A protein has these predicted regions:
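Conserved beta-strand signature within the Rossmann-like core of class I S-adenosyl-L-methionine
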Residues: 165-173
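SAM cofactor-binding core of SAM-dependent methyltransferases
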Residues: 59-122
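A short glycine-rich, Lys/Arg-flanked "PGG" loop and its adjoining helix->strand segment in the class I
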Residues: 151-165
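S-adenosyl-L-methionine
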Residues: 1-62, 70-77
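Class I S-adenosyl-L-methionine
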Residues: 184-236
């Protein structure tokens, strides 16, 4: 794969591929991915997210950087009337999601962009997404890389545009530097409202927010994840 974003120097992710894939995952990249894949949108292109799915869906949710796919597959399996779209440039993560999708039988309400999420966000209509997730994103800890963090001045307006009024934006991280960064930028953004009323609101997930493998590893290593929920304020 090549970088789809016009300026590859501004990419928000690291490597494209890690360890060699097992045979089944390699086969799923060849057989299942073509059925679920969203082609990288071209500049100026518009995509109706509801039209991506073979059956009508009541809502469309978006996960940016779905990792190995556990959260996304869970949401698809537990919300069969919702179309779940995910963007992930790391091919091993895409292969992991495909295995879960095949095992759960949720091909009809999952669609995948195996690439940078930003061209997709730019192609979506206003108020077309009912919920968005950015969970355990790369913290880019070095100061010179902070502008690569997905949640920030460049992408919050993108999310605000595509999210419906009252839609939820869910963020999570075990890196306190990134948590502070996300809070600082999202709380200051005029289109988002933080829903927390006390510490328990950001220390615990709700029942419809499943744990991920990364989260479990973080807890085992002694790190405490933080869970943030924001609402897209009504327009006008």
């Amino acid at each position: 794969m090549t970088d789809s974003f016009p300026d590859a120097s501004k990419r928000l992710y690291g490597r494209r591929k890690g360890r060699p894939l097992r045979k089944r995952k390699t086969e799923l990249l060849d057989t299942l991915l073509p059925a679920l894949e969203i082609p990288v949108p071209q500049p100026g292109e518009r995509i109706d997210p509801h039209a991506l799915f073979p059956k009508p869906v009541r809502d469309v949710w978006l996960e940016v950087g779905f990792g190995s796919g556990h959260h996304m597959a869970w949401q698809a399996a537990n919300n069969p009337d919702v179309g779940v779209v995910g963007a992930e440039p790391f091919i091993n993560g895409v292969a992991g999601l495909l295995k879960l999708v095949a095992d759960e039988g949720v091909q009809d309400n999952v669609r995948v962009l195996p690439d940078d999420a930003r061209p997709l966000l730019d192609a979506l209509p206003d108020q077309s997404i009912g919920r968005a997730f950015v969970l355990f994103a790369d913290p880019w800890p070095k100061k010179r890389h902070w502008e690569r963090r997905f949640i920030g001045p460049a992408n919050l307006p993108r999310l605000a545009r595509v999210l419906k009024d009252g839609a939820e934006l869910r963020l999570a991280s075990d890196d306190m530097g990134l948590v502070r960064w996300m809070l600082e930028h999202t709380v200051r953004h005029p289109d988002f409202e933080w829903t927390a009323r006390g510490p328990s609101d950001w220390r615990h997930r709700s029942e419809d927010w499943p744990p991920t493998r990364y989260e479990e590893k973080a807890i085992e290593a002694g790190r405490k994840p933080v869970f943030l929920r924001f609402i897209r304020k009504p327009r006008g």
